[in-house]
Amino acid sequence: MSETDYSVRSFKGGYDDNITYLVTCMRTRNQFLMDASVPLKQILPFVSKKGLIVLFITHTHGDHTAYMDEYVDAFPNLVVMIYKDSEDKIQTTLKRPVKHGDIVTVGQLSLEVFHTPGHYPDSVCYLLDGILFTGDTLFVGRTGRTVSNGSDTRQLYRSVYDTILDLPGHTIIYPGHDYGPKMTISIDENIAISPLLQAEDEDDFVQRMADYEVERTFEN
């Protein structure tokens, strides 16, 4: 697969510089969304005549599902993909639970599912060719935080270091928020600019995360 087989359009808004991605299979014109973080009116002018067929949810924090009902109402055949343990958290007829290692096909595009708990228990990343949609697991410049109910810093370490950083360094991450100096970045570039991606081991990562939260407190 090459980049000419699909296009990715980014829409920023929502609660806190959230990003929803609209991906189009150029061969079939089928489309999918990554998260429902922005209002339907933002993406509607860019929806093809065949319409949306899949909505992927990276995790069930409210800012990532905020506008899901709008999309489901507008596209009655829209299938919502969500981590298997959270299927009951969303109220829609057409939903498909996914688990680690699943392959999901949209048009002629295939996405691999990675369960990446830590920021939240049902956090999932989706790999499409050379790009990885990371939700709140990994941003440009840092990892996600572990301050909400269900968060686990050690789980996040394993998700990031044993799963994401094990991918080819040229893989481009597409995060769920625009928090960094630019919207997307390669894994290798991200490691170079992020102390949270330079930990020597799990304990070192836990300490770096604790230090990061202290720094945030003083900054605010």
Report the location of each language-model feature.
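Active-site HxH/HxHxD metal-binding segment of metal-dependent hydrolases
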Residues: 16-17, 28-31, 36-112, 192-196
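Core dinuclear metal-dependent hydrolase active-site scaffold
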Residues: 10-11, 21-22, 101-128
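Histidine-centered catalytic micro-motifs
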Residues: 55-65, 114-121, 174-180
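Metallo-beta-lactamase
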Residues: 121-219
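Hydrophobic residues at beta-strand termini and immediately following loops
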Residues: 11, 98, 187
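Structural motif
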Residues: 3, 47, 108, 165-166
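Conserved beta-strand hairpin/beta-sheet module of binuclear metal-dependent hydrolase folds
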Residues: 2-50, 125-135, 141
